[in-house]
């Protein structure tokens, strides 16, 4: 089984995260940021990655550190669980609607962490959650997972719907890319490694 458990503590956050890439989308999420919990549950459900997250942080200052650091730890765990990446499909893509919102995600598990992100330039709050923190979450995930991620909101007006559409599109694309291809016995690269 491709699993990982990461514990990361800083002066700003304390995070414990475990995942199973070969799961069924089971989750147990406990952070002090309600909307982040919702997005992590959505991510787990649609990627089929079993996910457990226990996090605390300096949310009296801002949600920023907790949201970004959970993204970082999730990226670290995905990278660790992928191991040598033998047999994976490597690429994944999805276009996912959430009511009026539509988002596209295309990923390459390349070992080259790059995020190309477009949220239509929208800003505002989802309850008490700053919408622009979605980019910080995705940036942390991308940099520490070693994955190239193109993530683009194509349309939408409701910030909750856009955030959820972005998260679901990443989850579905990642589900495809981490899947083991029974025909592939080696690492999916002409270089021989990723």
From Swiss-Prot:
Keywords: Amino-acid biosynthesis, Cytoplasm, Histidine biosynthesis, Lyase. CDD domains: IGPD. The keyword Transit peptide does not apply. Its EC number is 4.2.1.19. One of its GO terms (biological process) is L-histidine biosynthetic process. GO terms for molecular function: imidazoleglycerol-phosphate dehydratase activity. Pfam families: IGPD. The keyword Mitochondrion does not apply. It is found in: Cytoplasm. This is Imidazoleglycerol-phosphate dehydratase. It comes from Persephonella marina (strain DSM 14350 / EX-H1). The gene is hisB.
């Amino acid at each position: 089984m491709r699993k990982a458990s990461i514990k990361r503590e800083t002066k700003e956050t304390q995070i414990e995260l475990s995942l199973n890439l070969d799961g069924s989308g089971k989750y147990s999420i406990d952070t002090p940021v309600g909307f982040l919990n919702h997005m992590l549950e959505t991510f787990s459900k649609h990627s089929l990655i079993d996910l457990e997250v226990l996090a605390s942080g300096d949310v009296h200052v801002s949600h920023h550190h907790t949201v970004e650091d959970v993204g970082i730890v999730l990226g670290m765990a995905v990278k660790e669980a992928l191991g040598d990446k033998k047999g994976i499909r490597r690429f994944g893509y999805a276009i996912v609607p959430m009511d009026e919102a539509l988002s596209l995600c295309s990923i390459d598990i390349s070992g080259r962490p790059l995020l190309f992100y477009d949220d239509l330039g929208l800003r505002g709050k989802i309850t008490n959650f700053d919408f622009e923190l979605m980019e910080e979450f995705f940036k942390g995930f991308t940099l520490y997972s070693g994955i190239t991620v193109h993530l683009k909101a194509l349309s939408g007006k409701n910030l909750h719907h856009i955030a959820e559409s972005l998260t679901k599109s990443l989850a579905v694309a990642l589900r495809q890319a981490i899947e083991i291809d029974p025909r592939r016995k080696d690492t999916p690269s002409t270089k021989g490694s990723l």
